[in-house]
């Protein structure tokens, strides 16, 4: 049998809930994604709580709450202690996302599910990988290799490939085949025939995706129209994910049009977010990387966007029309919720949603058709304690401090007794004479005598009072005192300034003291009141989610052509639609498990380990194929002297084989290649490529619905045997490796 693979959804199947899946490979348990929603519903984590202690490794795919939101809570409360793997941007931006969530919640509630320290603890030991980096696990995971690949949805977002004994398990959710301003498209189509593909059906029913140029024009025209009539524009956004694409669109448009309307990016960590993003250019699109290499122009040096970390700065901004991108996208908390309540009753204003709101949130309610004219909103804020409440609070705090001091003194006394009891050579403690005599009091009278408290008996171990003395011993060697090189390291001034400006340390972490500067730490309580908000402003939703549409999903799954397919994360209708399509056109083994339902997707193929004998390899001729080398081998299975299964040379002359062309030709790329060679080329009907006057190329083979390939493809050259025919054929052969 092949590698044993079982998949168990813990959250996020047959609905739009957060993503969390248990994948077991030969007994090694991966938790892939550990998401939560903006409602922080603990009931969603019950399946995870039952298996958290058995997890051996955690893989994170994207830096948003739906993929990483439950990680701090799971590590603090559920017993999750496995190592975590992610790309550098997912680690850094995910950390900032959780900071923003915590600070937003703490401002309006007594949020206690996790703290800043819990967030730091969860992220401090994340093992960071680069794209396509093969990381070999050890110990229980010996023989398993993991590697992140470009997903195209968010900065650093990953498709995970897990390999064991030559079989691939691909986890690909929330991917985007389209190239965007700051991201390249996914590389999912580069995988062929994996043993298992785990993917989502989120957009399986969405097929009318607008062209990027037209979408951007509608987006900018809608914003401009409301600004020009004196209205404000609110874009509820995530903390550090899809908002980056929106910032670039606005920045470039403002530069081209010369607009004077201010743009504000308002989150608790906006400055930190942009500072980190500036250093992640190698993770972005080719155009951004090339622009920086040639002109040193960083696309995220935002000249038209002002970064804010508190709403007071926005309130103090000059009056007039403005664009504000504020978190959270769900409108359940954060600055966006406050701004919506303030701006909703003005018909000149616009609330522009760029993604579908999470189920059960205010954003989802406002996106319904038709939108509501009134919404009931519970607004909460912290108010300082006063009067009797403040006195009671201070008394309680003083009582707690006294109890803590008493506990500390008792512990110290026990330690002192233990230290004296264990030191046989220690001198006897000096006894304090507690007798109060008239000579001591002297002429000061009874007033001084009353200072002494009756019943006070010094401990038997009391000693004469002394100033504390600490002996700081230093280590020496033959050359003198040993120095610590870390004491002389000069920190990067830019990082220091950035950290201080952003409210964190040089690693981007926030501590409780820094958080206290962002939050009012005076004694306070949460006051809540329900408001009926009149929704007179315009409500518009546009698709900037950065996900492939249904047609592209089907085409890519057909191209990948997995042996077994597992569908997750979509409503029931979309899941069943994609499942039936794949069963009919792509793969006979398609699974869509329920929560905590384990499906066994072990490969039906048998895998064996064999040794390549020296006799065989001495006659093999390799040919370069990208970063690898390939060769055709004729051999038979036998055993060497060490009784190991090996591939041995054939006893006689090997029979000739037909030439094999290795490679994957894209007709669009080949068209550009022929054009560079001076060949007149154009697309004809049915996807054919007309080359010159007489020759036509076309791909043929099994196809699925809407043209998606579902099997091996062939390339046909049609035309008379002429000079152009042979020239085009040679150009075609040059695109492959011949074995």
Swiss-Prot record:
Ranges in coiled-coil conformation: none
Family annotation (InterPro entries): Beta_Casp, CPSF2, Cpsf2_C, CPSF2_MBL, Metallo-B-lactamas, RibonucZ/Hydroxyglut_hydro, RMMBL
Presence of the UniProt keyword Secreted in the record: no
UniProt region (Disordered), positions on chain: 411-430
Record's keyword annotation contains Protease: no
Example of a GO biological process term: regulatory ncRNA-mediated post-transcriptional gene silencing
UniProt-annotated location(s): Nucleus; Cytoplasm
CC per GO annotation: cytoplasm; mRNA cleavage and polyadenylation specificity factor complex; nucleus; plasmodesma
UniProt main location, coarse: nucleus
UniProt keywords, alphabetically: Cytoplasm, mRNA processing, Nucleus, RNA-binding
Domain of life: Eukaryota
Free-text disruption phenotype from the record: Impaired antisense-RNA-mediated gene silencing. Early flowering.
SUPFAM superfamilies linked to this entry: Metallo-hydrolase/oxidoreductase
GO MF annotation: an example: RNA binding
A Pfam entry, by short name: Beta-Casp
UniProt feature, compositional bias: Basic and acidic residues: 411-423
CDD domains registered for this protein in UniProt: CPSF2-like_MBL-fold (cd16293)
Record's function text: CPSF plays a key role in pre-mRNA 3'-end formation, recognizing the AAUAAA signal sequence and interacting with poly(A)polymerase and other factors to bring about cleavage and poly(A) addition. Required for antisense-RNA-mediated gene silencing.
Assembly and interaction partners: Component of the CPSF complex, at least composed of CPSF160, CPSF100, CPSF73-I, CPSF73-II, CPSF30, FY and FIPS5. Forms a complex with cleavage and polyadenylation specificity factor (CPSF) subunits FY, PAPS2, CSTF50, CPSF30, CPSF73-I, CPSF73-II and CPSF160.
Entry similarity comment: Belongs to the metallo-beta-lactamase superfamily. RNA-metabolizing metallo-beta-lactamase-like family. CPSF2/YSH1 subfamily.
Protein's recorded name: Cleavage and polyadenylation specificity factor subunit 2
UniProt organism field: Arabidopsis thaliana
Organism taxonomic ancestry: Eukaryota, Viridiplantae, Streptophyta, Embryophyta, Tracheophyta
Gene, per the UniProt record: CPSF100
């Amino acid at each position: 049998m092949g590698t044993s693979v079982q998949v168990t959804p813990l959250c996020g199947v047959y609905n739009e809930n957060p993503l969390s899946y248990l994948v077991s490979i030969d007994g090694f348990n991966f938790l892939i994604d550990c998401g939560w929603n903006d409602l922080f519903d603990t009931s969603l984590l019950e399946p995870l709580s039952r298996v958290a202690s058995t997890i051996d490794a955690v893989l994170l795919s994207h830096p948003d709450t739906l993929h990483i939101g439950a990680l701090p809570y799971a590590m603090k409360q559920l017993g999750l202690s496995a190592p975590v793997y992610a790309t550098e941007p997912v680690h850094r931006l995910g950390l900032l996302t959780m900071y923003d969530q915590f600070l937003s919640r703490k401002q309006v509630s007594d949020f206690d599910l996790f703290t800043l320290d819990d967030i730091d603890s969860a992220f401090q030991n994340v093992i960071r990988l680069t794209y396509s980096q093969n990381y070999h696990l050890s110990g229980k995971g010996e023989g398993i290799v993991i590697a992140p690949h470009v997903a195209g949805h968010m900065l650093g977002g990953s498709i995970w490939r897990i390999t064991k004994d030559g079989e691939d398990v691909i986890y690909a959710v929330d991917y985007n085949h389209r190239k965007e301003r700051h991201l390249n498209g996914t590389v999912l189509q580069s995988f062929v025939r994996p043993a298992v593909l785990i993917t989502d059906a989120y957009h399986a029913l969405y097929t009318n995706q607008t062209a990027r140029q037209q979408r951007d024009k509608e987006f900018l025209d809608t914003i401009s129209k409301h600004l020009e009539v004196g209205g404000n524009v609110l874009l509820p956004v995530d903390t550090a994910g899809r908002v980056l694409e929106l910032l670039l669109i606005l920045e470039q448009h403002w530069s081209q049009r010369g607009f004077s309307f201010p743009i504000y990016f308002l989150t608790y960590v906006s400055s930190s977010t942009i500072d980190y993003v500036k250093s992640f250019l190698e993770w972005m699109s080719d155009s951004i990387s090339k622009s920086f290499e040639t002109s040193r122009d960083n696309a995220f040096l935002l000249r038209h966007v002002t970064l804010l970390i508190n709403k007071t700065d926005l309130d103090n901004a000059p009056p007039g029309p403005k664009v504000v991108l504020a978190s959270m996208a769900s409108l359940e908390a954060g600055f966006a919720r406050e701004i919506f309540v303030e701006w909703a009753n003005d018909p000149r204003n616009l609330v522009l949603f760029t993604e579908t709101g999470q189920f059960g949130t205010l954003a989802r309610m406002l996106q319904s058709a038709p939108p509501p004219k009134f919404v009931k909103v519970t607004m909460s804020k912290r108010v300082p304690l006063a009067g009797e409440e403040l006195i009671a609070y201070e008394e309680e705090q003083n009582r707690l401090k006294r109890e803590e001091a008493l506990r500390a003194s008792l512990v110290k006394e026990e330690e002192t007794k233990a230290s004296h009891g264990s030191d046989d050579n220690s001198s006897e403690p000096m006894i304090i004479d507690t007798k109060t005599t008239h000579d001591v009091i002297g002429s000061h009278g009874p007033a001084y005598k009353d200072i002494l408290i009756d019943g006070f008996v010094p401990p038997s171990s009391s000693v004469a009072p002394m100033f504390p003395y600490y002996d700081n011993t230093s280590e020496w060697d033959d050359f003198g005192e040993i120095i610590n090189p870390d004491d002389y390291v000069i920190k990067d001034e830019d990082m220091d300034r950035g950290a201080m400006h952003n409210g964190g340390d040089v690693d981007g972490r926030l501590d409780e003291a820094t958080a206290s500067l962002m939050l009012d730490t005076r004694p306070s309580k949460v006051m809540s009141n329900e408001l009926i908000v009149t929704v007179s402003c315009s409500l518009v939703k546009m698709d900037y989610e950065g996900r492939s549409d249904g047609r592209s999903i089907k085409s890519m799954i057909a191209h990948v052509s997995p042996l077994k397919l597992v569908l997750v994360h979509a409503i029931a209708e979309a899941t069943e639609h994609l499942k039936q399509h794949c069963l009919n056109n792509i793969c006979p083994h398609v699974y869509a498990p329920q929560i905590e339902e384990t499906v066994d997707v072990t490969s039906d193929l048998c895998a064996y380990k064999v040794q390549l004998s020296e006799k065989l390899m001495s006659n093999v001729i390799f040919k370069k194929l990208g970063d690898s080398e390939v060769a055709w081998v004729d051999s038979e299975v036998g055993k060497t002297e060490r009784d190991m299964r090996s591939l041995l040379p054939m006893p006689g002359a090997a029979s000739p084989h037909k030439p094999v062309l290795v490679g994957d030709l894209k007709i669009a790329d080949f068209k550009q290649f022929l054009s560079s060679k001076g060949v007149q080329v154009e697309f004809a009907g049915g996807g054919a490529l007309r080359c010159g006057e007489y020759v036509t190329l076309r791909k043929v083979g099994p196809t699925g619905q809407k043209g998606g390939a579902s099997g091996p493809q062939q390339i046909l050259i049609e035309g008379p045997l002429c000079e152009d025919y042979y020239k085009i054929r040679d150009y075609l052969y040059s695109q492959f490796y011949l074995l």
